[in-house]
Regions:
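Short, surface-exposed ligand- or partner-binding patches at beta-edge/loop junctions that are enriched
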Residues: 75
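Rhodanese-like catalytic fold shared by cysteine-dependent sulfurtransferases
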Residues: 1-30, 38-72, 80-116
C-alpha cells in the first residue's frame, strides 16, 4: 500500500497525513515539498529530513516540470500554506497529493527529527 493510499481524504481533493504517518526516510517515489520561505526552512523549526524547499509563490511555475505520477507531501509551518499548495497541485492535474497536517509545528511537537 502506498503512502497516498493510506492517507485520509480531504474535501479539497488532496489527502491529509499526520506527522506520525510520514515515514523518514521517505519511501521511494514520494517527494516532500516544503513551501515555506528560505529563512523558515533553515530557522528555528528546521525542516523534515529529505524535504525540498519550494516557496509557495513558486510552486505553480516549478510544478510544470514535476512528475504527475509521483506522490507529493506538502508541508509548511502550520498546514495552511501547504494546504494551498496541495490544492493548487490537484487543480493542475496531480493525482497523488498530501498535506502534512499541523506542519512543522506539529512535527516538532511530536519530537520528530529535523534538519536545519
Amino acid at each position: 500500500m502506498s503512502l497516498f493510499d493510506a492517507a485520509r481524504p480531504n474535501p479539497a481533493g488532496f489527502k491529509d497525513l499526520s506527522p506520525a504517518e510520514l515515514p523518514v526516510p521517505l519511501p521511494e517515489g514520494v517527494r516532500l515539498i516544503d513551501v515555506r520561505e528560505p529563512h523558515e526552512f533553515v530557522g528555528e523549526l528546521g525542516h523534515v529530513p529529505g524535504a525540498t524547499l519550494v516557496p509557495l509563490a513558486t510552486v505553480p511555475a516549478q510544478a510544470v516540470s514535476w512528475d504527475r505520477s509521483a506522490e507529493y507531501v506538502m508541508v509548511c509551518r502550520s498546514g495552511g500554506r501547504s494546504g494551498q499548495a496541495a490544492q493548487a497541485l490537484v487543480k493542475a492535474g496531480f493525482g497523488k497529493v498530501m498535506n502534512l497536517v499541523g506542519g512543522m509545528l506539529a512535527w516538532n511537537q511530536a519530537g520528530l527529527k529535523t534538519e536545519k
